[in-house]
Curated annotation (Swiss-Prot):
The record marks 161 as: Interaction with histone H4 N-terminus. It catalyses: L-lysyl-[protein] + acetyl-CoA = N(6)-acetyl-L-lysyl-[protein] + CoA + H(+). Keywords: Acyltransferase, Chromatin regulator, Cytoplasm, DNA damage, DNA repair, Nucleus, Transferase. It is found in: Cytoplasm; Nucleus. One of its GO terms (cellular component) is nucleus. The gene is hat1. It comes from Schizosaccharomyces pombe (strain 972 / ATCC 24843). This is Histone acetyltransferase type B catalytic subunit. Residues 41-43, 183-185 are annotated as: Interaction with histone H4 N-terminus. InterPro entries: Acyl_CoA_acyltransferase, GNAT_dom, Hat1_N, Hat1_N_sf, Hist_AcTrfase_B-typ_cat-su, Hist_AcTrfase_HAT1_C. Belongs to the HAT1 family.
Length: 378
């Protein structure tokens, strides 16, 4: 290590997040994934030797305490100003713009929408407006910077924001494992004048608890509230990451499968517009996501389809690609446009083949139904 390197530290590595329960016993610890929004693109803290930065969060309301230790700090006459760690982090650790409600947010009496068990442990998902949960939300804003690529603060004074909090629970403790924020947009509908489009915005499962099924539990619980609310007409996702897209595909596909959508007589490669519209209204998915789930379903049984049915699937995917990229594609000449669409189809199909390896297979159609489907595709 050079003399200069001793004074330079990667912020992601030297910042440690520690959660403690209400008895101040350590619950878990982890590091942020991103700090560029706080310390710049290089994610570097400069001017200290043997630096350790610990942010201790006390559950259940995630009240933070910042501790900084080092063996030596650059002298004022060195000509280089060390990073103001405390001043910089304190800017983000608490959102002071929010009007914290007078009553404390009580996790024990908050609206619980789903409970489940995993590895002998109990988990609970709570639902609240960000105003109701202002006491915890003022401390969670920084987590969108730590764990979401391109994440940013949301307006916690806007009553249209909802938050869903995932806790691991015992008789005495509630320890945070993840959270999701949802914004309720107005959506016009001729039958429902105060219709809502729900948009999933921030979705975070804390690092020690990822890849354990908690993301699917949280997503499915949230979607369940959408489906039960007659004012919510559909729901979408804001700037989803690749990992979240994968989670979403798996959850939405399995939900449609359990609803029997893929077993209906009208579900065949030549889907009618009337059937698609009715199922979009029923599932509250966007047209793009519903089409994607249907395409995944056809891919799971592609080998069992006739040549004519496979062609219908292929043309359906290409038509969707064309519609989604209409403005760009219309600027190309016909031959180049056809090539672009075909290449996009090949990439999409390769992605589907990887996804369906982890999806449950559809039940094979009876010979009588297969004959009917083949005839309807001709």
């Amino acid at each position: 290590m050079s003399a200069v390197d001793e004074w330079v530290h990667n912020a992601n590595e030297c910042i440690e997040i520690v959660q403690v329960n209400e008895k101040h016993e350590k619950d878990c610890q982890y590091h942020p994934s991103n700090t560029y929004a706080i310390f710049g693109d290089a994610e570097v803290i400069y001017g200290y030797k043997d630096l350790n930065v610990t942010i201790t969060y006390e559950c259940p309301l995630m009240v933070p305490k910042l501790e900084i230790s080092y063996s030596e700090r650059l002298a004022p006459d060195s000509g280089v100003e060390p990073t103001d760690i405390e001043g910089t982090l304190n800017t983000y650790l608490k959102d002071r713009s929010i009007k914290v409600e007078g009553n404390s947010f009580d996790v024990h009496s908050a609206n619980s929408i789903h409970n489940y068990s995993f590895n002998g442990k109990t988990f609970k998902i709570l639902q609240a407006t960000v105003l109701e949960a202002s006491e915890i939300m003022q401390h969670l804003q920084i987590f969108s910077l730590f764990f979401i690529e391109g994440g940013s603060f949301i307006d916690l004074n806007d009553p249209r924001w909802m938050v869903y909090l995932l806790y691991e629970t015992t008789e005495d403790d509630y320890c945070l494992r993840g959270y999701c924020t949802v914004y309720k947009y107005y959506k016009w509908d001729k039958l429902i004048h105060d219709g809502i489009r729900a948009r999933i915005s921030q979705f975070v499962i804390l690092p020690p608890f990822q890849h354990q099924g908690h993301g699917s539990q949280l997503y499915n619980a949230i979607v369940s509230t959408f489906l039960k609310n007659p004012k919510i007409l559909d729901f979408t996702v804001e700037d989803a990451s690749e990992a979240f897209d994968s989670l979403r595909d798996h959850c939405d596909y399995k939900r449609l499968l359990s609803m029997g959508i893929f077993s209906e007589p009208d579900f065949h490669p030549s889907l009618s517009r009337q059937w698609i519209n009715s199922k979009i209204a029923e599932t509250k998915l966007t047209q793009r996501q519903f089409s994607r789930c249907c395409e995944l379903a056809f891919t799971t049984k592609l080998k069992k389809l006739s040549l004519l049915e496979r062609k219908s699937v292929r043309l359906g995917i290409k038509e969707r690609i064309f519609r989604q990229n209409l403005d760009v594609l219309l600027q190309l000449d016909k031959s180049e446009r056809i090539e672009k669409i075909h290449n996009a189809y090949e990439n999409q199909f390769d992605e589907y083949k990887q996804i369906v390896k982890k999806l449950p297979k559809l039940k094979e159609d009876s010979p009588r139904k297969r004959q009917k489907l083949a005839q309807s595709s001709s």
